[in-house]
Amino acid sequence: MAGQTAVQGANPGNKAAVPPVVEGPSREERLVAWARANQKYLAIGLGVVALVVLTTWFLSVSAKRKANFARTQLEQAWSAADAGNLPLASGEFQKVASTYSGTEAAYEAALSLNQGRLLSGQSQLAVDDLRKFIGSNPPARYATRAGMLLGAALENLAKGAEAGQAYEQAAAAAEADFAKAEALLASARAYRSAGKQDQAVAALRTVLEKYKETASYPVAEIRLAELTKGS
């Protein structure tokens, strides 16, 4: 009976109490807490980033200074060459090429040095140095010029077949059509001097097939007609 009385006395309209919702920390608060807990690692990370930025800036400034110094030395060497002082110019070109390796001025100096050697009859020395230069994988425009100089040096040594190959390599390295065509004309000439008529004809036909818009095209037509007797 007591149990029934308790049940009957209960108010069926009363609802169970809902516990209050307790909100957790906000995203910003969690971020602040994480930063405080990891401030040591954050400081290290920021230090690394700052070091990378500073190193990059320093290397950029150093590279620019190196390039400027190299250009100044190169211009002085050119001035000596223009004045007819080839021994002084040669020494300065060598200095720029070795001291400022990798700069535009160093590439120019290496080519100017070997051009001077051709003019002074040092073709074999030029051949040896130019082959090393080309083997160092310089930018295409310098590889092309070096190949042309190498071909000329080999022609001076009466090595027409090797010269033809050097000119072909220069053509392959060239980026502009006119430069490719000029190198192929030189290749045909060198091959012809060595009695390699088939290679000479092939070089000329490449000009006629691929580089019709260049100034070398009519020259190639004439030389091919001479070699093939119009056939």
Language-model regions: role of each:
Residues L86-P87, S123, G160, Q197:
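TPR-repeat structural position
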